[in-house]
């Protein structure tokens, strides 16, 4: 082969190699090119319609909150009173205290757990937005820090606000509930005159244990005409397709208004024995916010 022919061959081979390399790189780029971002769906755009940032020191805003009083539910040990809920340094604090004072509703030989207790050994608070702030559909969020010691039973939850429709027919959503080492996300409604529960449990040990409990976290309820999702720090905990509740007693409760409850319970049917726990126990809330799509904004 002459030098000229060899030179031509070398040059042609180089061109062929470059062409093959270009095709390979192009094909590889086509394979690894990121998927285009989805077009924004306007139905996923939320508008802030109500909030309580708890920035004013003193009692919670009476335009937003009222109180449960006394012994209320679940055979819990605490006596609910308004003075255990207060705002300080930009936080709502619901404080459970160990106290000892007479039960003003005590009745000798009573068979009712609320009135047969002669003494109050613990006090706390439960605040509720009933008749003040009620919503149908939306994104409900709370940023808070909870005490995970034995006996502590904090919750951020909703109940149905429809007059004359009682629990469980009115529905219940526990956006945040904690007791005995476990965070729960619960949804309940009435079916055949019994509460039908959808419950998801997450041990605090799996979330980070004591270190996790020292931080603030965001609990979310996303609710529209089709579904209800419960999230913790943006991660889905529980989900309900609302059609599943269409056969509920007195109709599907998840198409009707709800109100909020924030409370710090002690002991009772689920909270555990608080006798070895050092008080006070604090449920600290940074804010509660409600977002809605514009069609549902109130």
Where are the predicted features?
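Bacterial N-terminal signal peptides
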Residues: 14-26
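Accessible peptide chain termini
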Residues: 1-2, 271
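GH16 jelly-roll
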Residues: 30-298
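Intrinsically disordered, low-complexity segments enriched in serine/proline and basic residues
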Residues: 4-12
């Amino acid at each position: 082969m002459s030098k000229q022919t060899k030179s031509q061959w070398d040059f042609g081979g180089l061109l062929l190699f470059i062409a093959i390399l270009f095709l390979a790189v192009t094909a590889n780029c086509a394979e690894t090119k990121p998927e285009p971002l989805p077009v924004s769906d306007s139905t996923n755009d939320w508008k802030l319609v109500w909030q309580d940032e708890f920035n004013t020191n003193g009692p919670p805003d009476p335009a937003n909150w009222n109180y449960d009083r006394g012994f209320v539910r679940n055979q819990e040990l605490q006596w609910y009173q308004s003075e255990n809920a207060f705002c300080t340094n930009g936080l709502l604090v619901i404080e459970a205290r160990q106290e000892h004072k007479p039960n003003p509703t005590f009745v000798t030989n009573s068979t009712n757990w609320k009135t047969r207790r002669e003494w109050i050994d613990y006090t706390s608070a439960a605040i509720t937005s009933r008749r003040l702030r009620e919503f149908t559909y939306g994104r409900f969020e709370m940023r808070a820090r909870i005490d995970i010691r034995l006996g502590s039973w904090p919750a951020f939850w909703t109940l149905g606000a429809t007059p004359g429709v009682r629990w469980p027919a009115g529905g219940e959503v526990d956006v945040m509930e904690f007791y005995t080492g476990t965070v729960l996300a619960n949804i309940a409604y009435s079916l055949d005159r019994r509460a039908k529960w959808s419950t998801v449990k997450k041990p605090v040990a799996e979330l980070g244990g004591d270190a996790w409990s020292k931080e603030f976290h965001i609990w979310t309820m996303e609710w529209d005409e089709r579904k209800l999702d419960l999230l913790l720090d943006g991660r889905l905990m529980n989900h309900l397709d609302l059609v599943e509740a269409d056969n509920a007693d007195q109709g599907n409760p998840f198409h009707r208004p709800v109100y909020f409850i924030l409370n710090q319970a002690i002991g009772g049917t689920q909270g555990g024995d608080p006798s070895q726990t050092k008080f006070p126990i604090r449920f600290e809330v940074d804010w509660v916010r409600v977002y809605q799509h514009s069609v549902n904004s109130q």
